[in-house]
Regions:
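Positively charged n-region of N-terminal signal peptides that target proteins for export
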Residues: 1-5
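Bacterial N-terminal signal peptides
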Residues: 7-16
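Secreted/extracellular ectodomain signature
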Residues: 20-145
């Protein structure tokens, strides 16, 4: 039984870290930031994009590694047709990544009756909170504007 538990624990560790690795395209990044958006308020969604933009401007795109993780009502930021889509495109060109919680997508799908489309910059992750924990374990600092 202990051996089975050990194998199960090792399996979970391998699976949880293999799906969506941190950005290896920024080997010279001095700062690693994960921005959380879980609020439906458009002001907060704009604010999280402003923070990302300010960080890129201050440090330069090669010196800061940023991932915006959206879950719960904050997922609306990453839905196709969002008024901030062009801003996200610009941030993405500067290396900012966007993660969309699959648990929230499933909840939206159930409520809406169809799966909502995400902006092209968004990458689905199994759970937004888990993604944040993975990144903080890798040295990222959590900022929740």
């Amino acid at each position: 039984m202990k051996l089975l538990r050990l194998f199960f624990t090792l399996f979970i560790c391998l699976v949880s870290t293999s799906g969506y690795a941190a950005n290896d395209d920024k080997p010279f990044a001095e700062k690693k930031i994960v921005l959380q958006i879980s609020d439906p308020n458009p002001f907060k969604q704009t604010l999280v994009l402003n923070v990302a933009n300010n960080l890129v401007k201050h440090y330069g795109p090669d010196k800061v590694d940023i991932e915006i993780v959206a879950f719960g009502p904050g997922l609306r930021l990453l839905l196709e047709g969002n008024s901030n889509e062009s801003r996200m495109n610009g941030l993405s060109k500067n290396g900012v990544r966007f993660a969309a919680c699959e648990n929230t997508i499933a909840g939206f799908t159930k409520k809406l009756g169809y799966k909502p489309e995400l902006v092209s910059q968004a990458t689905p992750v199994s759970a937004g909170v888990v993604r944040i924990l993975e990144l903080t374990d890798q040295g990222y600092r959590l900022v929740k504007p």
